């Protein structure tokens, strides 16, 4: 946003340099990115009156001009501009003067004729071509009215000015207007803010007799209003208005269009002006566009619309694309006599979608996208009518035609001085706090110690108590807040929370096993959003994704981990082991916030041990992956259970479901060969666990176990069981019958093949017995061991 200091003084006048003002504004949180000084590098620039023009005798494209500069004698200037003519009032750089770019003006002879100065175009005095009025793009600037010769040209053009360029954050849309900025400056300097003139001399004719309005999509257009103005005289706008627009980065067109743009910058409220006679009916109907409906916009482009677009129609055909751009056949032209001035509130999301899809970003659409101040909608329309009456000789019809409700102009928020003081760290009185809010234009009252602040609709960045506290600190001045040391009743040393400690343990365990931590995108493509998801839940899609590949919130960490491994393998890094701790997202239906759950996932491919001097290479496999997961559980003092399962995307015979305390929390498995091949991977193993579920289990401290004082006894058994029986089932039976002397169990061999019936397998298990209080006897061990064997037999196991 470009803020002219000369324009700002219409609303608030502070006795400060622009540099001091910019520094103060920056300290309150609105960054002034640059100060544009239109007087910089310019010297001896005056208004000249062209008394005569004669052709140059030695050059076809040059003219010899006698120019009155307000001095005793006119000066002779040779000029090559095609539009120079006798009687004009022009910009002249005198001899000894300077122009931007280091141009020095000297006496010279051009094709034998002396020239004592230079008649200038706007571009030559530092005005950008893209904002220069079209009729002066390729020639000198001509004042529309007589100006006294010798007058400072910068003063006559309202360029004796400095312009602040704001770098605004998206939440400060209120500063996208001169009045919004004036409220801010008035609060900073505790001075009065002056509002512009609004009242017109209305005729006795009523606009309601000429126009009706109907809105069929009130959810998208909660308020729509219009006023009618007759007998408009189309012409150039006054010089002061043209150059305020130029300094704001907008090209002047004519008085009607310029007034619309001027009010946009003044109030931050976009307006649209229709040629009333070209609308084609006496009614305006606002609705959603029909799918594949078309209209031609002001830029001459034929636009194909969607049913998500808002259109303004004459009851039948679109005459404007609501909040984005008008239609070409109802635009204001030199033949326009009667004008309809529109002011409305449009749904920000709809405007954003339409403007981005059609690539029609404008000053208007950008303001609608951020949300506009309801308090200014009707004011802005009235201001435009006043300016049309004043500068276009128009007649304003009485009455406003409107549809819908503007709603409340304020949002009340309750706060206390104690809350403010505890937050900012020093004490202000109720009166001081209320005074700050009143300076900002917030109506405030004190009720029994509670400060009720009525926040105006222009400040959409303020919605909670903390926002109000920020305003107090900003306006009081961050630099003026006294420095104080914090006071603590009890001082304690910092320490990790339980979750932080566990997370550090998990990371150390995984990294000790050779895995590297990865951090991947939370967004995946829609096609992969539910890959590997244990829960059948709805997905959450972005309304405006950066790309299709990042359009949906993930329900698993594995899709991007697979991408990361594939990326590495494609670049000859074939031994990759990664883990990630991150959030996944499960939908709860439209309008509800999703559930965010933290997951722990890992992926391994290639060789786990690949250095030849260490011996035989050891490729990663299912049991290695399972061992890493079990090691994590052991470090957290958790007991995981495993059972065979099926997960889409994993090998049907090499997948296990992981459960904790009877609840499924994840899985381990080998990537399905087809999926691995699609990613150019060899055998690849993954795991994914509900990390939140792991963290929720309270296990207390992991106690130290002393070295046993008495010797233990080990017994090995081999069991022939059906193929579908798992080792965990056997171990469970063993532990149930091992009484208090069974210390540990270990599966050390699994065999399938010759010497066994089809559908059978042999599992070898080592049982360790230990009595921490006494020496074990054979009788005691045999009794417990036999009990275990009998229990195994009852469950179908054959002792080999």
UniProtKB/Swiss-Prot annotation:
<feature type="domain" description="tRNA-binding">
    <location>
        <begin position="39"/>
        <end position="154"/>
    </location>
</feature>
<dbReference type="GO" id="GO:0006432">
    <property type="term" value="P:phenylalanyl-tRNA aminoacylation"/>
</dbReference>
<keyword id="KW-0694">RNA-binding</keyword>
<dbReference type="InterPro" id="IPR005147">
    <property type="entry name" value="tRNA_synthase_B5-dom"/>
</dbReference>
<dbReference type="Pfam" id="PF01588">
    <property type="entry name" value="tRNA_bind"/>
</dbReference>
<dbReference type="Pfam" id="PF03484">
    <property type="entry name" value="B5"/>
</dbReference>
<feature type="domain" description="B5">
    <location>
        <begin position="408"/>
        <end position="483"/>
    </location>
</feature>
<dbReference type="InterPro" id="IPR041616">
    <property type="entry name" value="PheRS_beta_core"/>
</dbReference>
<dbReference type="Pfam" id="PF03483">
    <property type="entry name" value="B3_4"/>
</dbReference>
<feature type="domain" description="FDX-ACB">
    <location>
        <begin position="708"/>
        <end position="800"/>
    </location>
</feature>
<feature type="binding site">
    <location>
        <position position="471"/>
    </location>
    <ligand>
        <name>Mg(2+)</name>
    </ligand>
</feature>
<dbReference type="InterPro" id="IPR045060">
    <property type="entry name" value="Phe-tRNA-ligase_IIc_bsu"/>
</dbReference>
<keyword id="KW-0030">Aminoacyl-tRNA synthetase</keyword>
<feature type="binding site">
    <location>
        <position position="470"/>
    </location>
    <ligand>
        <name>Mg(2+)</name>
    </ligand>
</feature>
<dbReference type="GO" id="GO:0016740">
    <property type="term" value="F:transferase activity"/>
</dbReference>
<dbReference type="GO" id="GO:0009328">
    <property type="term" value="C:phenylalanine-tRNA ligase complex"/>
</dbReference>
<dbReference type="InterPro" id="IPR002547">
    <property type="entry name" value="tRNA-bd_dom"/>
</dbReference>
<dbReference type="InterPro" id="IPR020825">
    <property type="entry name" value="Phe-tRNA_synthase-like_B3/B4"/>
</dbReference>
<dbReference type="GO" id="GO:0140096">
    <property type="term" value="F:catalytic activity, acting on a protein"/>
</dbReference>
<keyword id="KW-0963">Cytoplasm</keyword>
<keyword id="KW-0547">Nucleotide-binding</keyword>
<keyword id="KW-0436">Ligase</keyword>
<dbReference type="InterPro" id="IPR036690">
    <property type="entry name" value="Fdx_antiC-bd_sf"/>
</dbReference>
<comment type="similarity">
    <text>Belongs to the phenylalanyl-tRNA synthetase beta subunit family. Type 1 subfamily.</text>
</comment>
<protein>
    <recommendedName>
        <fullName>Phenylalanine--tRNA ligase beta subunit</fullName>
        <ecNumber>6.1.1.20</ecNumber>
    </recommendedName>
</protein>
<keyword id="KW-0820">tRNA-binding</keyword>
<comment type="subunit">
    <text>Tetramer of two alpha and two beta subunits.</text>
</comment>
<dbReference type="Pfam" id="PF17759">
    <property type="entry name" value="tRNA_synthFbeta"/>
</dbReference>
<dbReference type="InterPro" id="IPR004532">
    <property type="entry name" value="Phe-tRNA-ligase_IIc_bsu_bact"/>
</dbReference>
<dbReference type="InterPro" id="IPR012340">
    <property type="entry name" value="NA-bd_OB-fold"/>
</dbReference>
<dbReference type="GO" id="GO:0000049">
    <property type="term" value="F:tRNA binding"/>
</dbReference>
<keyword id="KW-0648">Protein biosynthesis</keyword>
<dbReference type="Pfam" id="PF03147">
    <property type="entry name" value="FDX-ACB"/>
</dbReference>
<dbReference type="GO" id="GO:0004826">
    <property type="term" value="F:phenylalanine-tRNA ligase activity"/>
</dbReference>
<dbReference type="InterPro" id="IPR009061">
    <property type="entry name" value="DNA-bd_dom_put_sf"/>
</dbReference>
<keyword id="KW-0479">Metal-binding</keyword>
<dbReference type="InterPro" id="IPR033714">
    <property type="entry name" value="tRNA_bind_bactPheRS"/>
</dbReference>
<dbReference type="InterPro" id="IPR045864">
    <property type="entry name" value="aa-tRNA-synth_II/BPL/LPL"/>
</dbReference>
<feature type="binding site">
    <location>
        <position position="467"/>
    </location>
    <ligand>
        <name>Mg(2+)</name>
    </ligand>
</feature>
<feature type="binding site">
    <location>
        <position position="461"/>
    </location>
    <ligand>
        <name>Mg(2+)</name>
    </ligand>
</feature>
<keyword id="KW-0460">Magnesium</keyword>
<dbReference type="InterPro" id="IPR005146">
    <property type="entry name" value="B3/B4_tRNA-bd"/>
</dbReference>
